[in-house]
Structures are given as structure tokens and as C-alpha cells.
Amino acid sequence: GDNDRTYYLQQRWNQMEIDENTPTVGTKLQQAYDMALTTEGLDRAQLDAQRDRLYDFFKMRVLLDKPIILLSSGELRKLKLTETLLTQPRVLIMDNPFIGLDADTRQQLRVLLGEIAQKGQLQLILILSKTADIPPFITHVVEVDHRIVRPKVTLDEYLAHRQPMPDHVLSKKTAEAILNLPYTHKEYNAREVARLNKVSIRYGKRTILKDLDWVVGNGEHWALSGQNGAGKSTLLSLICADNPQSYACDITLFDMPRGTGESIWDIKRHIGYVSPEMHRAYQRDIPALRIVASGLKDSVGLYVKPSDEEMAACRFWMEVFGLKGLEDTTFLKLSSGEQRLVLLARAFVKDPELIILDEPLHGLDNRNRQLVKEVIDTFVKRHNKTLIMVTHYANELPSCIDHHLQLVRHD
């Protein structure tokens, strides 16, 4: 919508852009409530009861005064779900409604949709990329495979004929090519990738992070978890030098204390990064190959012509992620899954010492999720490669994970 068109990557962390006219969760939901009141034959008491239930279901009351641009990706999805269900639609089409939600919220949503389906209140169509996300109340499945629409079958028929995923999707040849890549920053010798001492972050009256101590050693592979709104993306924004509050915190990155003369580019040159916010911020319809190449210089667009060697690296990573043949296809003409794979290729292309993957498997099908996990496992086998990965699905974590930090929400 209009919010997405004016959104940029660091906007969530820049509070100086928030004023009394900035839309909040409460104003957005009030608009949905007012629209629902115009529905013919709808009783106000019934609507009020539905609103109260949705607010309880998705824990929306604590978010009502929060500006929409400050929402985490999971909180934003909960807002959109509440808004949509509040308008009492007769036909509901939901595109991957479970991604970005923590385990408790996913289960609550399954229960809610199951009750709606059982009552026959509306026609429900779910677009899902993960077979495991299909709720048991679904009656029929239509599979789209390589742009071919398969015949409609019952859920039982679909599950009975599913082919098991092979143990390995990444070819041995490609894995060896990744392991044998030349190192970009031969002078890199940081002992610690990140050290945070008693870090606290507040937005208005709400505490996001409180007295957090965290050390990420060189070569470690971390899983970062927590409920929606627990501060995972905020923490990553401090490490990626996207959050202005980092200068007021005791943070050392790559053995360099923040605010001691280093530029954000000194930090970013070592980091490859993918997140839901980054995906949302990419609205430029430029060829996929150019987007991958922009990762070489940490820019949104491509402003410096890459060398032949750099372009070869871009094509290599596009091929790794199954994007060969899509180099000239512009970003907005790709599917959301293909877009995510392009952004992953962009994150890996400069051979970063730290790879930060915030829910990188959003919208990917079963095969591509397996592929990405194998690419991650292979890449971090190399010397001086550190990983921080966020996901709400434990089975999405690659096997290389050897450390875990769980954040707690401070309401």
C-alpha cells in the first residue's frame, strides 16, 4: 500500500521522522472497525465481541499506540490479520499467513481459522509455500508446480502423493565451488564480531532491549529467537549500523568500539544481510543481476560499474540459488520467493565475514528452503565466517548452529 511505497530500510529506527500525524496501530484498526460497521446486517455488539476477541488473540492492545513504522515484521503481520478479519469478509484469501509469526501466534491463528471454517462463515483460500503449514481443516489442495496448475485433489490425496525431499539439494560440485572461493578480506583478523555491554533500547515508553550482554566470537554460528516484538530485528539493526541509538550504547563491532571514528561502511563491508524489512524496502524494478551486484558496495541501486571478476561472482551466486536465466528479469516481475533468493545472493556476493539472516526462508518452497540451509552450512565451513540467523521455525535452522540467544519481550 501507500505505506510500503514510502518505506525505506532504516525508517523503523529513525524516531525523528515520527510525529503526531504518523499512523498508529489504533488508528488503522479503528478504520477497519468503521468499515465493518457499514456491512449490511452486521450487529454492533457482534462486531465489538469480534474485535475484543481478535485483540486478545493477537495481543493487540499493547500495540494500539505504537506507530506502524515501528512494528516488527511479525507485529505488522498480526496487524494485517486483525484488520482483515475485523472487516468480516465473505471470501478470505491469505498469502502465507503463518510466516513471520512466533509459534504461539501461529497456533492461535490455526485455531481461529479452524473455527471460522467450521462455522462456514466465509470461503477460505490459503496460499502456502510450506506443506507443513497446511492446517488440518483444509479440504482441498491445488498445487502450482513450475507455473503449472495441477488438478484439485483432497488434502488426504495430496499428502499421500507427496514426494519426500532428497537429503541433499545442493550439488557436490557447487558445494566445492563455495568452499574454494577466494577470500575477499585477507587482512580480516577480528577476534570478536560483536560485543554488547548492558545495552538498553527504548522507543517512547516501551523498552525493547534491557541490559543486554552478548558476545559473538569470530567463527561462531548463532540462532536468535524470541516472540514477535522481543527486539530481534532491533538487535540486528545495532550490529548492522542501521540504528542511530547504537552510538549511545556500549557496542564493539569487529574489535572497533562504536563512535571511535569508524564509518558505517567500515562495518558494513564485513556484513551480508537479509531481512523482511530489506525485502519490503526494495521497490525498484531493476534487473536481478544489478540488485545482486549492489551488494558488493552495500547500496540499494548500482552506482559503480563492477569489474568482470565481480560480475562473475554475481552470476555465480545467482546460479547457486537457482536463479540462472533470471539475470535480466526485473525485481518486481519476480515472484516473492524469487525476490528473496535474489536478496540472499546479494548478501553472499561480497564474501562477508558476518552473514546476518533475519527470517531468510520467508515464502520459499520446500526445495528452496532446503537449498538455502545447505548453502549456509557450506559457506560457514570456511575460515572466519560468522552467522547470526533469526527464524520462528526450529526446523529451519541449519545444522551448523552452535550458539543460541533467546530474547524476552518487555511489555
Task: Name these PLM-found stretches.
Residues 1-38, 236-300:
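ABC ATPase nucleotide-binding domain signature region
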Residues 43, 67-71, 303-306, 330-334, ...:
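Conserved ABC ATPase signature
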Residues 46-63, 293, 308-326:
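Conserved ABC ATPase "signature" region
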Residues 80-81, 344:
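Hydrophobic anchor residue at the start of the ABC signature
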Residues 92-96, 355-359:
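Catalytic Walker B motif of ABC-type/P-loop ATPase nucleotide-binding domains
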Residues 146-174, 398-399, 403, 407-411:
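Conserved beta-strand-loop-alpha-helix hinge in the C-terminal portion
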Residues 225-227:
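The feature captures the beta-strand-to-loop junction immediately N-terminal to the Walker
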